[in-house]
C-alpha cells in the first residue's frame, strides 16, 4: 500500500497527466479516469476518492471557464440539478463505505461511463426547440448523480451531459458548460462531506498530482477547443476505461 505522504510512482504521474489532457479536451473533469488509474495502484480507497475529487475541481474549473468565456453557459441548465445533487453529494461523501462495496460501485460506475463515452453520439441531439424541463426527472437525476459522486469521487458531468442533450433541454456545448460547472460544485460538496465524515485523505501523493493534473487540463482544453476531434477522443477514452475496469476486476478476483 502506497503511503499517503510518499511521492507517486512515475507511471501514475504520467497516467494522471494523460487523463487530465484527454478528458479536458472533450469538456470533462476526468474523475472517472483518475479513479480508474489510481485503482491500478496500491492506494487506499479514501485517498483515491479524495484525490480524484480534488483533481476534478481543478480540471473542470478550467473547462468551465473556457465554455463560459465562449458564451455557451446557460445558468438554467445548471442550478435545477444542484437543488438535489449538492446535499446528496455531501451525504455520499459523509458516508463511509466498506472497501469491497466501494470498489463494486466504482467498477459499475466506470463501466457505465466507458460505455457512454464509447457509444454516445453527442451530435445526435433533437433539432427542435428546447423542451420544457421535466422537474421530477431533474430532481431525481440530480439526487442519484450527487449520491454517486459523493460515494466514489466522481464529479457527475458524464451522467449530466447525456441527460441534458437527449431530453432536448440544451445543445451539446451548453450541456458541456453546465456539466463542467456541475462537476466543480458537486466535487466541492463531496469533498466537504468527506472532511466532515472523516473520510478525507490528502498528503504528498495527492499534492504532487495536482499540478500534474492542472498542466494536463490546460493543454488539453486549449487543444480540444481548437484542433482535436472530440468524438474520436471520447471513443478512445471509453475503450481505455473499459479495459481498465476489466484489468482491475481480474486483479480483484485473483486476490
Please state what every model-predicted region is.
Residues 51-66:
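Transmembrane alpha-helices of multi-pass small-molecule transport proteins
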Residues 139-193:
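Structural signal for alpha-helical transmembrane segments and their flanking helix-loop junctions
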Residues 43-54, 76-77, 169-180:
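Membrane-interface alpha-helices at helix entry/exit sites of multi-pass transporters
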Residues 52-56, 179-183, 206-210:
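Short hydrophobic/aromatic, small-residue-rich stretches within specific transmembrane helices
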Residues 31-32, 157:
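Helix-loop boundary and gating motifs at the non-cytosolic
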Residues 1-24, 33-41, 45, 65-148, ...:
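Juxtamembrane transmembrane-helix boundary motif
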Amino acid at each position: 500500500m502506497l503511503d499517503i505522504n510518499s511521492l507517486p510512482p512515475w507511471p501514475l504521474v504520467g497516467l494522471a497527466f494523460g487523463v487530465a489532457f484527454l478528458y479536458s479536451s472533450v469538456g470533462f473533469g476526468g474523475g472517472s479516469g483518475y479513479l480508474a488509474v489510481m485503482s491500478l495502484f496500491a492506494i487506499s480507497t479514501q485517498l483515491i476518492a479524495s484525490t480524484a475529487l480534488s483533481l476534478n475541481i481543478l480540471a473542470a474549473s478550467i473547462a468551465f471557464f473556457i465554455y463560459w468565456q465562449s458564451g455557451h453557459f446557460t445558468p438554467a441548465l445548471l442550478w435545477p440539478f444542484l437543488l438535489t445533487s449538492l446535499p446528496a453529494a455531501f451525504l455520499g461523501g459523509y458516508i463511509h463505505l466498506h472497501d469491497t462495496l466501494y470498489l463494486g460501485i466504482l467498477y459499475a460506475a466506470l463501466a457505465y461511463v466507458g460505455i457512454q463515452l464509447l457509444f454516445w453520439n453527442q451530435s445526435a441531439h433533437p433539432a427542435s426547440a428546447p423542451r420544457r424541463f421535466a422537474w421530477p426527472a431533474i430532481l431525481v437525476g440530480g439526487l442519484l448523480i450527487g449520491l454517486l459522486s459523493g460515494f466514489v469521487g466522481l464529479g457527475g458531468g458524464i451522467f449530466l451531459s447525456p441527460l441534458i442533450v437527449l431530453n432536448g433541454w440544451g445543445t451539446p456545448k451548453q450541456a458541456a458548460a453546465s456539466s463542467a460547472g456541475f462537476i466543480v460544485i458537486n466535487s466541492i460538496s463531496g469533498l466537504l462531506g468527506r472532511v466532515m465524515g472523516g473520510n478525507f485523505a490528502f498528503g504528498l501523493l495527492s499534492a504532487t498530482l495536482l499540478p500534474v493534473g492542472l498542466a494536463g487540463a490546460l493543454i488539453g482544453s486549449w487543444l480540444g477547443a481548437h484542433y482535436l476531434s472530440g468524438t474520436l477522443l471520447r471513443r478512445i477514452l471509453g475503450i481505455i476505461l473499459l479495459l481498465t475496469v476489466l484489468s482491475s476486476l481480474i486483479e480483484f478476483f485473483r486476490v
